Amino acid sequence: MGLFVNPDQSAFQSALNAQIYVDKSGLIEYTNSVLESTDAFICNSRPRRFGKSITADMLTAYYSRGCDSRDMFSSLKISQTPDWEKHLNKYDVIHFDVQWCMEPAGGPENLVDFITQNTLQELRSLYSAELPENITSLPEALSLINDATQKRFVIIIDEWDVLIRDASADTKIQDSYINFLRGLFKGTLPTRYIALAYLTGILPIKKVQTQSALNNFNEFTMLDARGFAKYIGFTEEEVKTLCDQYHRDFEKVKRWYDGYLLENCQVYNPKAVVEVLRWNKYQSYWSRTGTYDAIVPLINMDFDGLRTAVITMLSGSSVEVDVSCFQNDMINFSSKDDVLTYLIHLGYLGYDQNTQSAFIPNEELRQELTAATRRKRWDEMMAFQAASDQLLDAMLDLDTETVADEIEKIHSSYTSVITYHDENSLSSVLTIAYLSSMKYYFKPIRELPTGRGFADFVYLPKPEFRSDYPALLVELKWNHSAHTALNQIKEKKYIASLEPYIGDILLVGINYDKKTKKHECLIEKA
């Protein structure tokens, strides 16, 4: 057992000892299936507090020859698979956490030498005959050991991207680190001495001239998780089970912490779910993850459409984003799409592969991003807040003329980014118009199923505001009339869809006439 070579299972045991542990050992079935193949080079990126280190510790405990982990894994899901013991504790494992190494190394400029020297020293204690003293290259050392013994290594790097994020301006350090990783993993020889390479961090592998610096790796990210989706965060079924176990309101947990969509799998923030299960406090835990301060300068970058996109998402809508050009680093931001893509990797935004659009996943993140805009007192945000406040007040006062006028103004403000041509474009303007409502209401429910169709929008007030703010049931029409919209709400019994909600309800019909370019609104109490 060493610091980097063949660690024991104690780190993973600490995770198992926690009050709440969700079994993700099914991932090992996949890694076992690709061992000693060209598919065994894996990079899994995900946000902070999404279980990166626990996964790395689990793989170490399973494969490391430095421990006996049979009892540990015999009660986990992996033990239900055939031949689960075949690879258990059978490999020399090299595992290091780049973030931890920064301090003892004395800074990022010394990191590669620190990792290399310490790993070589530990390898010599195991393979003194195979590893001459004059060998100073880690890839060469692994190749020599493999040539003499035919043994392959499992290499696990936690927080692989620390230098990419924290030393982003120093190209010399970046180049040295990337070259170290290339020497370790790229080419024919690494396929001989590596049984499994597993990198984990926040960012995917950095691109060099549009190509991945390690293009032999299979990447599983917040943009494209594929088979890793159920191992990134907590799944909905896992959260339901935990809520039953800890007697928590699942629907409330869902509103606050759900929202990540990975391969049609609903994924929750594990850190937040664990905290609310333990303490029953529904609040944002995100600012404690260490990335919050990084987003304030990001969303204030001077890119066309960036602030508009953030405001649109804060209002409950999604925005299209081109994720293909982001270089997976901290310095090559060239457009709003690069910024939004980075925010997806950080976990501040969700991503829908089917529509190629970004959105704010849940109430927790909506609060954090709203706070970030306030830090810089956005003129755009303050103007929209004022207009939206007036719109919401007018709606609550049943002032239909003012509601129509305010929607008209917001429509005019957004003509550069939203072209009116159908009810969908009208709905985009409506979500922006109701930005102010997010203080008092949950994210609007789009097309809520009812007995005879779908309600266009439903705004449910947060519990603490239900005595002052009614639920809003909104129907939109295009080239019809507000009367038609209101009648549809009644005829199709949309109100029944709000059961078992108890509280006041406003029925809102809004129409846009393309010829007159006017909005019309009618409001009734249910």
Predicted features along the sequence, with ranges:
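Extended hydrophobic-aromatic, low-complexity segments
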Residues: 352, 441-447, 465-471, 482-485, ...
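Structural motif
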Residues: 154, 470-474, 506
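Metal-dependent nuclease catalytic cores in nucleic-acid-processing enzymes
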Residues: 184-191, 341-349, 431-436, 488-508
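Active-site metal-binding core of divalent-cation-utilizing nuclease and nuclease-like domains
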Residues: 144-149, 438-468
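Mg2+/Mn2+-dependent nuclease catalytic core
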Residues: 174-180, 478-495
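Phosphate-binding site recognition
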Residues: 1-422, 437-441, 445
